[in-house]
């Protein structure tokens, strides 16, 4: 089982969609692409202002975060018992989140060192306009709208991607969701909490809160969102790569419009919950 692909286990509909019709996938993907301008227009009305944030940390801090993630991952490998309930899919969920904690430790240190606002620079700004409820409501609606508008494209690509991998002769890990029936009781509850709450918050804080501002500054808004989405998808392996890449683009767009991490984590967590619910049905 590919441990990296389990760090976003619920965002792997490709494994469940392998037997679905590529024709249906193409139709859904085409529908999703045709809806994109409408979705963009609606989201622009929700959040018309262009928000700019300047990150003072650099790529040396990113390298430090990667090294810290490697260390905490290896420590988890060595220290977590290789027996129930820490074996199997739960282990595959825990280890990547330990790596995320290591990376976020460096990200928090970098923000406190370089930014006047400290840790809030990672996508948790204070609301200075006074309209807290209105601002939060618009951000939540934007996240929900982006998720709903992106679902046809994501699901369509999920149907198509296994056929592409098969054509290329490349294998993908299909075990992330299919191994979940092995979990019962507290292990199953822990796995759901990790997948729907913990992983979205940690991963969005690192990828969209820490990496994306730096990449946007150096490679433009479009280039930065694309590159971070590629990195985001690459850690999950070939099996779910393209669907997760599309999800990463959606989450990057949410962060770009709101400059907040919690709407990204909201969309991420809801999507994970949706896919898990469908897989369990």
Feature roles, as predicted:
Residues 13, 26-40, 148-160, 164-281:
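Transmembrane helix-loop-helix hairpins at the membrane interface
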Residues 1-123, 127-141, 273-281:
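N-terminal, membrane-interfacial amphipathic/helix-forming hydrophobic leader that caps
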Residues 78-98, 110-199, 217:
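Juxtamembrane helix-loop-helix connectors linking adjacent transmembrane helices
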């Amino acid at each position: 089982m590919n441990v990296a692909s389990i760090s976003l286990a619920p965002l792997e509909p490709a494994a469940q969609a392998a037997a679905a019709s590529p024709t249906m996938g193409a139709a859904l993907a085409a529908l999703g692409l045709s809806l994109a301008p409408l979705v963009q227009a609606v989201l622009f009305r929700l959040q018309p202002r262009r928000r700019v944030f300047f990150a003072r940390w650099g790529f040396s801090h990113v390298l430090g975060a990667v090294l810290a993630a490697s260390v905490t991952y290896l420590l988890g490998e060595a220290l977590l018992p290789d027996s129930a309930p820490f074996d199997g899919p739960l282990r595959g969920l825990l280890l990547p989140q330990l790596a995320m904690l290591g990376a976020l430790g460096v990200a928090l240190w970098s923000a406190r060192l370089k930014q006047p606002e400290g840790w809030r620079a990672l996508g948790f700004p204070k609301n200075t306009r006074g309209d807290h409820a209105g601002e939060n409501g618009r951000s939540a609606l934007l996240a929900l709208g982006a998720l709903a508008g992106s679902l046809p494209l994501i699901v369509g690509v999920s149907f198509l991607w296994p056929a592409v991998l098969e054509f290329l002769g490349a294998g993908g890990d299909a075990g992330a969701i299919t191994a979940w029936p092995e979990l019962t009781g507290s292990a199953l509850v822990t796995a759901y909490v990790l997948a729907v709450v913990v992983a979205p918050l940690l991963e969005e804080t690192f990828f969209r809160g820490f990496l994306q501002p730096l990449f946007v500054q150096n490679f433009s808004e479009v280039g930065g969102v694309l590159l971070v989405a590629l990195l985001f998808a690459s850690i999950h392996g070939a099996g779910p790569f393209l669907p997760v890449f599309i999800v990463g683009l959606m989450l990057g767009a949410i962060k770009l419009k709101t400059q907040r991490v919690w709407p990204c984590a909201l969309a991420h967590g809801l999507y994970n919950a949706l896919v898990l619910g469908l897989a369990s049905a």
